[in-house]
Amino acid sequence: MKIVIVGCGRVGASVAEAYDQKGHEVLVLDILTAAFDRLPSSFGGIALRGDGTDEDVLKRAGAEGADVFLALTEGDNRNVMAAQLAAEELGIERVIAKINDPLRAKAYAELGIATLCRTGLMVDAIDHYLGFPSSGLPGMLAPTGHHEAHHDRASRPATNAAGSLTTVGGGQSSSESTTSATVPNAGPTTPQEA
């Protein structure tokens, strides 16, 4: 199974390692090169520095045709943007966005994005540990709304930014991985967004 992960923070790196060890084809994108230090030296997937909210970067990285797309950065808005691109523009059917804010998680699920709410999962885990009934704060929400795929670029305004991709590690390489271009507003460079 081909799995694309945007965000190589603690969660993203752990998920990437787990699915790599299970023998899946794993591609990890992050805007910070240092984020890939979290991956073990045994990681056999592809690690690319690039902006997962940039459609051109996702395409050049090889995200099209993925079986699963996981947006796991620390930024709710970045995760939703990446998830929407994956579902609507790349046509990936199984897309999950990690969301920290439970109110946003429900709203995004209504827009057709499956959400994984860390806050809800934590409350559920504490309830379970203490033997309490569930507080009702959802940890995982399936999409209740609908998104439409848009594959016809000719019908949309052209974008002027070609994102940058750089191979930073991993067991495989990509011929597109060394392509680079200047991107205005390439995004946050703090670990909180990685």
Predicted regions and their residues:
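Cytosolic regulatory regions of ion transport systems
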Residues: M1-A194
